[in-house]
Amino acid sequence: MTTFVLVPGACHGAWCFEPLARRLRQHGHEAYPITLTGLGARKHLLNASVNLDTHVADVVNLLADEQITDVVLVGHSYGGMVITGAADRVPERVDGLVYVDAFVPEDGDSCWTLATDDQRHWYIGDAHANGYATAPLPFFDPRATPHPLASLIQSIRLRGGLDRFRSKDYVYAAEGEGESAFKPAYERALADPSWRAHALASRHNVMRDAPDELLKILLATSA
């Protein structure tokens, strides 16, 4: 049995991973889709102080509270920042990492520095409304909520590399529209024999567009 913690991307809550989590449980695994502070059902906690450190702490605290010691962390999009930070904080609790069309930061990186120009425009385009939140894009699921801007701007601080973990998978959405901020991470994974790199016929929302293929990749991490 493998325990998965599933971390959504910007503006999304645990709901975006719940169908996948149900299928993982049907295969005998534990699965914890998480809603980060200030988002989804926790949107009432959104304020200017919520940042990347807050979201890393969300995951670290979940691992401690549930006494999870061999987790596979799965991060979609922005969630790649979060799982990297959490794995660095408590490497003794982490067995593997799966980046789903996600950022794979190095020390000092942020979403802002890794993003495309279009993404940076989105991050700050509607922030003037309250000064601290990025609005969901029009085509997002109706359940999407504003995302704390500070978490997209803050640089990550890491003490070690990803070579500490047994398995590392990168899932690239090969049919995304326009310039992809995630292609460089996929290409690095493809060239590194310590990674397993997967290109799926999917747009960015892989959980929705390629659920069967993503499930197979996650199940393979537990083999």
What does each model-found stretch correspond to?
Residues 2-43:
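Conserved HGGG/HGGXW glycine-rich cap/lid loop of the alpha/beta-hydrolase fold
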Residues 30, 38-71, 88-89, 114-117:
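Active-site loop/oxyanion-hole signature of alpha/beta-hydrolase fold enzymes
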Residues 35, 72, 95-98:
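Residue in the alpha/beta-hydrolase core beta-strand immediately N-terminal to the catalytic nucleophile
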Residues 48, 88-130, 180-187:
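Flexible "cap/lid" loop of the alpha/beta hydrolase fold
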Residues 74-75, 79, 83:
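Gly/Ala-rich beta-loop-alpha elbow adjacent to hydrolase catalytic centers
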Residues 107-163:
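The alpha/beta-hydrolase serine catalytic core
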Residues 170-172:
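Short beta-strand/loop motif that positions the catalytic acidic residue
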Residues 174-208, 220-221:
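Conserved loop-alpha-helix segment in the C-terminal half of the alpha/beta-hydrolase fold
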